[in-house]
């Protein structure tokens, strides 16, 4: 049995009861019209049946009636979403951001990247040492007297960060692997004040009572995640707005526009799909992260079920590219043509209240949602391949990564730095051998992403990663990753690093990667275009040029 798939064939996307009734009415009207026009009675009956059946025929994942409604809404005046984001002081005095959408109020929890995470990546998917506790989140739909009307798990990220020559090289290096280096995960919690009158009344009633209820629910979600060894925090009002603008590339959600084929964002194309619940699996979700993009968003939607022990689940995705992409060749995706604006809004981390119909949903047992194995953060950059030829990735910079120790030759350090720059790092080099770094720095030619320290001390504060190579190590400011390069591990500082990499004898293509209490031997991998930037390791004749599937 494939436990990575959360739905069974019996949970197929069904035509709604409303669509069936409308189809019957349309069929009857067609038959009546035919009869009035002189068609024999049996011919009118046949016509009525055929028209009714055609009205519910699925095309691209939607019935003909839905396509007709989509076309009508596309060519008529679009509805402008109305919402407001406010700050609310929680019981502890913490400022909590809340987004009001009619009678619904939304709080947003951000999942923090886990420390010491490693990810094994193949063409078919990935296996991480840390997963998002999705089952625990599904259990948070009902919390004592507070019942949430929905939870959206929104993941947004990219394989490589645009802006440097390293970007395209790294994109070719990872090839068909779903190696999403940078990924932010938000959990949007929606509370319907009109559907939980007693819970609101117990907390003071009105908007204040509803605000207290959703704030308490958000705090419980943070605790539930913490109990599963997953750190998280509640966003403030400005952070909620910023999170939405990250996905919409700075466009106010209230002013989004669309064509039939994509949503309009400045200078780019934003397209997407919903997922047929029959095919929702970790393998399908992994495939959504494979195409190179400026930003990919994947949303898992959880809603209360009328059946005990079950939860309604749906999924969708959006991808932002510079030009119109080729259609996804992934079985199980549902077209969003004509409704890309709604689809984009439904993938924002604000759980818009009237867009649940955008994603087909199905009932599944609560304990099966964990089989999706959702990642809590980005996988970081490709470090090497294991003994089975699978790619191994790790984060060597960013939140939760304070110190990285590297014992090896300069080539190893430059490969790490090159890939870090490709995946979004801004690296400052402090070294006693600047000439050894000059070739790489000049080739990348992007001084705001990679340069040697000392040219402008004020701009040095804009970097999030500092490499100490042959100079006295200092303590960088908070939030900055320090990477210490030495020839031997015996030279490392005494403090415990978040991640370490050892290249025996400072040569060759074998390394030992250690993080989070796990150590694994890897082989360095590269491609010719990367070698053109950083050269080759010492004393290696037969060098592995790429990963294996």
Q: Positions of the model-derived regions?
A:
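Short, internal active-site loops enriched in acidic
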Residues: 156-161, 239-242
């Amino acid at each position: 049995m494939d436990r990575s798939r959360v739905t069974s064939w019996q949970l197929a996307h069904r035509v709604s009861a409303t669509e069936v009734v409308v189809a019957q009415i349309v069929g009857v009207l067609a038959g009546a019209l035919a009869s009035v026009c002189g068609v024999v009675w049996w011919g009118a009956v046949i016509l009525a049946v055929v028209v009714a059946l055609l009205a519910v025929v699925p095309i691209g994942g939607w019935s003909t009636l839905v396509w007709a409604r989509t076309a009508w809404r596309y060519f008529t005046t679009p509805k402008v979403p109305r919402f407001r984001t406010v700050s609310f002081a929680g019981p502890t005095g913490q400022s909590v951001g809340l987004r009001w959408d009619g009678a619904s109020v939304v709080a947003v929890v951000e999942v923090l990247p886990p420390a010491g995470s490693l990810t094994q990546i193949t063409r078919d998917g990935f296996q991480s040492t840390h997963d998002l506790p999705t089952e625990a989140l599904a259990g948070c739909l009902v919390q004592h007297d507070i019942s949430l009307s929905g939870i959206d798990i929104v993941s947004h990220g990219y394989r490589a960060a645009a802006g440097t020559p390293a970007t395209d090289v790294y994109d070719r290096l990872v090839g068909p692997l779903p190696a999403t280096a940078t990924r932010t995960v938000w959990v949007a919690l929606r509370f319907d004040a009109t559907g939980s009158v007693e819970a609101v009344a117990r907390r003071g009633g009105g908007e204040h009572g509803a605000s207290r209820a959703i704030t308490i629910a958000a705090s419980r979600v943070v605790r539930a995640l913490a109990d599963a060894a997953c750190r998280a925090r509640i966003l403030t009002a400005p952070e909620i707005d910023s999170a939405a603008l990250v996905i919409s590339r700075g466009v106010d959600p209230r002013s989004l526009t669309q064509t039939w084929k994509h949503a309009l964002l400045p200078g780019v194309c934003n397209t997407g799909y919903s997922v047929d619940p029959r095919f929702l699996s970790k393998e399908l979700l992994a495939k959504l992260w494979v195409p190179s993009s400026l930003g990919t968003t994947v949303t898992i939607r959880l809603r209360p079920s009328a059946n005990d022990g079950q939860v309604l689940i749906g999924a969708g995705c959006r991808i932002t590219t510079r030009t119109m992409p080729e259609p996804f060749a992934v079985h199980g995706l549902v077209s969003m043509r004509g409704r890309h604006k709604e689809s984009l809004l439904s993938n924002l981390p604000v759980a818009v209240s009237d867009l649940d119909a955008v994603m087909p949903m199905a009932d599944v047992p609560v304990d099966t949602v964990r089989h999706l194995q959702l990642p809590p953060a980005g996988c970081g950059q490709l470090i090497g391949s294991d003994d089975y030829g699978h790619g191994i990735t790790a984060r060597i910079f960013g939140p939760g990564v304070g110190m990285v120790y590297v014992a090896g030759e300069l080539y190893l350090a430059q490969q790490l730095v090159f890939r870090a720059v490709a995946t979004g790092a801004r690296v400052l080099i402090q070294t006693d051998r600047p000439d050894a770094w000059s070739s790489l720095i000049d080739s990348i030619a992007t001084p705001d992403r990679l340069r040697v320290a000392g040219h402008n001390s004020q701009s040095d504060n804009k970097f999030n990663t500092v490499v100490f190579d042959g100079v006295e190590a200092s303590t960088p400011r908070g939030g900055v990753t320090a990477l210490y390069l030495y020839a031997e591990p015996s030279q490392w500082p005494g403090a415990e690093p978040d991640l370490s990499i050892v290249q025996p004898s400072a040569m060759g293509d074998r390394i030992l990667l250690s993080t989070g209490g796990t150590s694994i031997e890897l082989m360095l991998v590269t491609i010719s275009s990367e070698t053109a930037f950083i050269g080759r390791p010492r004393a290696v004749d037969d060098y592995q040029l790429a990963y294996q599937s």
